[in-house]
């Protein structure tokens, strides 16, 4: 392979694959090697689905050779947070030692949507155990240990989608899928210097994913660019009768330009507590967005937002995880 695919974004990889300049099999082998050799040093990988990935890559390659191109993710490997059911192809641990060897008899809807798009499942990625439901403040509360930041291994990768952020940031997968209840996509994306998209509630099916909070859980992508995240979201946001909260309208990626007159609200003093570098990045991003949007600074009503969300989260997570606390499974967790 004459092209080094590491740190090429999804859009570029897809273009090379479609043009038959890049082999899905060779691409997948490259990332499988990185997952096996580099992933452990970041504690970001729980299971490398080697045989499955090679099988899916070979199928994708043959389809593309035959002119059966499925779309922009066809032939591209990815990793997924280890709370999505992946059938018997790989254990689904929820990041917790008591479930180290557990498999399910079904696949999560997002896994099936990506399979149907021709994307290649290469790894199950690390996470805070039980998605943080048993102790978000302990980075070591993860099956693989504290997930390390690709920019500085002495720092944490964020959570609870720790492995998803770290794996994309360290170039061991081109993109990943995470979940967010209260910051679990945006936090690791921010910590690891990559793009994360936390969709509107109900945009992506949660069927086959661990439940932490029925009212707050969301599924979304982590990738190298915002454009990539939009492409991935378009693929995974499909109506699903297995999740009654999912929108019946499929998401369609729209490219905005100055002619669209988009309005963008920015919350006043929203980054007042951020450090200088973060503030600079924030305002630089706003200056770019000003080329396609009218930006208006707004103030939100003075409500106790944190207390409201915490009340919902604590009550729903206590209910969702009740069986595991009652039967003693929780005693096997790292966070206490």
Model-inferred region functions:
Residues 1-55, 291:
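An N-terminal boundary/leader segment
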Residues 13-19, 79, 98-103, 217-224:
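Short, well-ordered beta-strand elements within core beta-sheets of diverse protein domains
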Residues 53, 63-140:
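Acidic/His- and Gly-rich active-site-bordering loop/insert found
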Residues 43, 247-250, 261-263, 267-268, ...:
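Flexible, acidic loop-helix segments that line cofactor/substrate-binding pockets
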Residues 106-236:
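Short glycine/serine-rich loop segments
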Residues 21-29, 58, 276-299, 321-334:
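Acyltransferase
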Residues 198-283, 327:
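A short helix-breaking turn/cap at a secondary-structure junction
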Residues 73-94, 258-267, 311-336:
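Short helix-loop capping/hinge segments that flank enzyme active sites or metal/cofactor-binding pockets
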């Amino acid at each position: 392979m004459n092209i080094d695919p590491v740190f090429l974004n999804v859009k570029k990889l897809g273009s090379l694959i479609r043009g038959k300049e890049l082999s899905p099999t060779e691409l997948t082998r490259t990332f499988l090697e990185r997952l096996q050799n580099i992933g452990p040093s970041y504690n970001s990988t729980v299971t490398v689905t080697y045989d499955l990935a090679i099988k899916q890559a070979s199928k994708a390659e043959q389809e593309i050779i035959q002119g059966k191109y499925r779309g922009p993710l066809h032939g591209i490997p990815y990793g997924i947070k280890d709370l999505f059911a992946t059938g018997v192809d790989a254990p689904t641990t929820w990041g917790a030692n008591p479930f180290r060897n557990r498999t399910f008899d079904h696949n999560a809807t997002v896994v099936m949507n990506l399979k149907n798009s021709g994307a290649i499942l290469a790894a199950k990625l690390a996470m805070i155990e039980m998605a943080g439901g048993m102790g978000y403040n302990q980075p070591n509360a993860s099956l693989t240990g504290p997930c390390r930041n690709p920019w500085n291994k002495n720092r944490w990768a964020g959570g609870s989608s720790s492995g998803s952020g770290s794996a994309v940031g360290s170039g061991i997968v081109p993109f990943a899928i995470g979940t967010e209840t209260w910051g679990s996509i945006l936090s690791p994306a921010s910590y690891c210097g990559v793009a994360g998209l936390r969709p509107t509630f109900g945009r992506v099916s949660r069927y086959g994913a661990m439940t932490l909070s029925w009212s707050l859980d969301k599924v979304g992508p982590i990738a190298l660019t915002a454009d990539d995240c939009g492409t991935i979201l378009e693929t995974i946001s499909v109506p699903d009768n297995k999740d009654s909260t999912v929108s019946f309208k499929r998401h369609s990626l729209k490219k905005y330009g100055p002619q669209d007159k988009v309005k963008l609200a920015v919350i006043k003093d929203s980054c007042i507590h951020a450090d200088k570098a973060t503030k600079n990045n924030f305002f630089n991003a706003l200056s770019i967005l000003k080329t396609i949007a009218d930006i208006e600074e707004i103030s939100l009503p003075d409500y106790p937002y944190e207390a409201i969300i915490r009340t919902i989260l604590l009550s729903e997570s206590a209910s969702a995880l009740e069986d595991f606390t009652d039967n003693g499974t929780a005693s096997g967790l790292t966070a206490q």
